[in-house]
Structures are given as C-alpha cells and as structure tokens.
Amino acid sequence: MTGPGMTMPLDRSPGFGVYIHWPFCAAKCPYCDFNSHVRHQPVDQERFAAAFEAELATMRERTGPREVTSIFLGGGTPSLMKPETVARVLDAVAKNWTVPDGIEVTLEANPSSVEAERFRGYRAAGVNRVSLGVQALNDKDLRFLGRLHNVDEALHAIGLAREIFPRLSFDLIYARPGQTPEAWAAELEQAIGHAADHLSLYQLTIEEGTPFHALHAAKKFAIPDNDHAADLYALTQEITSAHGLPAYEISNHARPGAESRHNLTYWRYGEYVGVGPGAHGRFVENGRRTVTIAERMPETWANLVEAKGHGVTGGEILTRSEEADEFLLMGLRLAEGIDLSRYEAFSGRGLSSARLSVLQGEGLVAPIGNARLRATPAGMIVLDAVVADLAR
C-alpha cells in the first residue's frame, strides 16, 4: 500500500473511478460548453453536500462493493467548494466503497487568489493532486478567454500548489487568435519551467452554443487554420518530449509515473461512477456496461435526489458493438494504444486485417508487438477518421 500523497503504480488495469461534479462557477468562460452555472446568491453547500452523499449511496447500491482507484472533483469550479464540503464528499465515497490509502484524489481549481487560500483546507480533507485552470501565461489572452485571474495570480497559485500538494497539473489553451509558433514555444517553455509534473494542453475549439461561437461566426476573431494548428500541435509534442513530459494521450503530457490515474480510467475504458448535476457514469451492472446521465440543472438535480435518492434522468445499456467502438475511440487516444484481445472480447471479432494493413501503409497506426495497436503521431491528428475506419 502506498503512503498518503504517493502515486499508485500505473499498471494497465482499467480501474474504478468516482467523479464528482460541482457545477457552479464565478463566471462563465466564453469558450466553455461544460455544464457550469453562475449563481449571484450564495450556493447552499450544505444542501448539495447532503445530495452528493445521497446519490453516492444510491450508486453504491447499483455497483456493489468495489475498490476505488481514483476520485476526481471536477466542474464547474470545485475550488468554490468549502474544504468542509470536500471533506464530506470524500468521506461519503469512503463509506460506500473501499478507498485504499494514497489513491489519487484530484480537485480542479482556478488560480484566483481567493480560491488559492483554500488549498491547505483541501489538502487536509484528503486531496493530493490539484489541476489548475491556468489557460494562458499572458494577461491579454487571459482577458480574451474570460478568465478572472491574471498571470501573477496564476504563478502564485502554481507555487502554492507545489508547496501544498504532492502532485500538480495545470491546463493551457493554445492555437489562440494570432498566436505564433514562437510565442507558443516561449509560453510552453515557461510553463514547463514551473515544474508541474503534468500538463494538459488543449487547442482552442469553437463549441456551438458558446459566446465564442457567435463571435467567431460574426468574424469578430479568427483562430488558426488547420495547417497552422497542426504545426502548433507538432511543436507542442517536440517541446514537451524534449523536457521529459511526453504526450501519453493526445492532449495530456506527464513525466513517467505522473499520468492522471483518473483520466486513464476513462481512456482505458474502465468503470466510473458520475455523481452530481450533469455527471455521466459508465459501470458494469448485471454483467452489462450501463451509462448514467444526471439532470444538468443544479437545483432540479438536488430536488430529484431529495425525492428519490439520485438525479439520474437518462442512460442506456450499451451493446457489445457500442462497447467495442467506445473502447477504440478512447484507447487509441493513448500512446500505449489498445489491447487487441480486449477489443475482440468486446466485439466478438478481431479488427479487419485488410483495414489495418491500409492504415499501417498510410502511416496512421502501428502495432506494438503482437498484442497491442497504437495510433501514430500522424494518426492522432485524424483519429476520428481512423477510428471510424477501424470500426466499420
């Protein structure tokens, strides 16, 4: 058993994760299409903590006894939660399933000075990994992205997080309007210099229904075209690899052993319970993989939980074919690729050797020994098309 704050051995077992969704934000970022909500009155954290406890108990009834491999508090902005609320939620997870000492417990946080003041409380509650939504390291782009912090606050939060938590990750968004390769290289080098052991690096995308979608459609700003974005992606791989943070997934980079155990559960097609407004879960129930989808509106979700013990309003039981397709889509995002025998167990058949031969000839996929298959760097860029071809 590992000690508090240490990383678990990163074997390839898919795992069983618990995801908690805190849906509230201080402000809605213009690029964000996540289930997040702004409230101008204080949130009743006591009510939501009790609702999390109740829904976790209901999920335990559905999953049966399990050993948890990771816990992730996402959002929204979980760093708006009081440390006491976080402690209640983590205690509730431990009451319902086996939680070994030292498993990864991540909390997403914004780097504003107000939220950083809560870091020691989160650590005392049991959080051992923080993921900071830095997004940019210059004030002009932070304002463009609608962030409430500035660069000085971000650097202060990074330093404080390094001091308090055993593990730290932070996010950056690139392929921003007017961003040159030289500017991105300098910013990325600066980020790596702050000694995070994990970086999540996302290209700016325009999501339907967001303010950025309307502004982009009105030609108020432009993002890099596909060729320029591909060049920035290639530059990202080059710089991170040179500094010992290779991509272990399309957008995620880590020093060996510092990969996100929770996110690996998703990509390795493990099981996870989703609790909270808008949360999704995928776990095996009565021998079949079941999808759960919770009510998105926070207050409506809480009403449902208080009435019947959960806020799940949608879901399905996946067919074997759907499981196989999801396994491909998630697993080929990883540098380690997929276990071909596991795909066959899901689908009842192997991948088409003819299609594999064509994709290998095009340099889009490559075998790892006789047992695994991975997407190449070129294949990662067009992964949706590669998966669609393999799944036919």
Q: Where on the chain are the PLM-derived regions?
A:
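C-terminal scaffold of the Radical SAM
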Residues: T2-G17, N35-R62, R66-R349
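Short active-site neighborhood of thiol/selenol oxidoreductases, capturing the structured segment around
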Residues: V18-W22
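Local cysteine-cluster metal-coordination motifs and their immediate loop/turn environment
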Residues: P23-S36
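Short active-site-adjacent structural elements
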Residues: L340, P367, V382-L383
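Short amphipathic alpha-helical interaction segments
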Residues: S347-G361
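A short, conserved structural fragment
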Residues: G361-N370
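Minor-groove-contacting beta-hairpin "wing" of winged helix-turn-helix DNA-binding domains
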Residues: A371-T376
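Short, amphipathic alpha-helical interaction segments positioned at domain boundaries
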Residues: A378-R392
